[in-house]
């Protein structure tokens, strides 16, 4: 087996974890009229250097990831409270180079990622409203929670490290709060992502990962024309990886970014987003930019 598989395999795992647990997503706890459907298609580009922990013999990893996703969401009534159910199907193409055990290698891989399902409920300040009732609704203080699940159905080959899927479940409970102040909305959220064991890792190894804890903040400015812009930041820590009992380093990273949503028609809008690594203890420094319709 070529050593170059290691660089791509662990890198894809990093990308999948980032997508699931380090999202910079503003307006996650905004209300919507019951029955409203959302269909979103998007593309993202990630590029940068990745620093792996001591459990993995990889150095000088430089990666480029092209990712696409298709997402569907529906606003629902949860015992009189506003809520949403969301389904995301990702696909990724990754290419990169790295030194594995001192040998310079390169790798290309592509495939479907693990699909994700998320259910959210607004416990306070977000009642379930019809389309007509929603016309008179004004957001103030909203408190909500969500539960996200990553389902291990993505591309995975146990004979190789280069996989898009992770071959393990991930569960992410989150608590969020938002406060509207005139044209501004401030949103805060904290979460923990828990992982099951991958007992079919490359070479018959067992891969475990500690919970990953995250906190994110958004300052969102709304205009009367439907356009909105946000400044985003997230801090996450934990997520230590252990392979066959050999622990790596605990992660501690900060990312900052911005989002701009531009209405095109009454029912369509374009969202532009980007983020950079501000502080990276492990996981590397990489930049991400994308567009969604």
How does the language model describe each region?
Residues 49-50, 80-83, 127, 183-186, ...:
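Repeated loop/turn-to-beta-strand initiation elements of outer-membrane beta-barrel proteins
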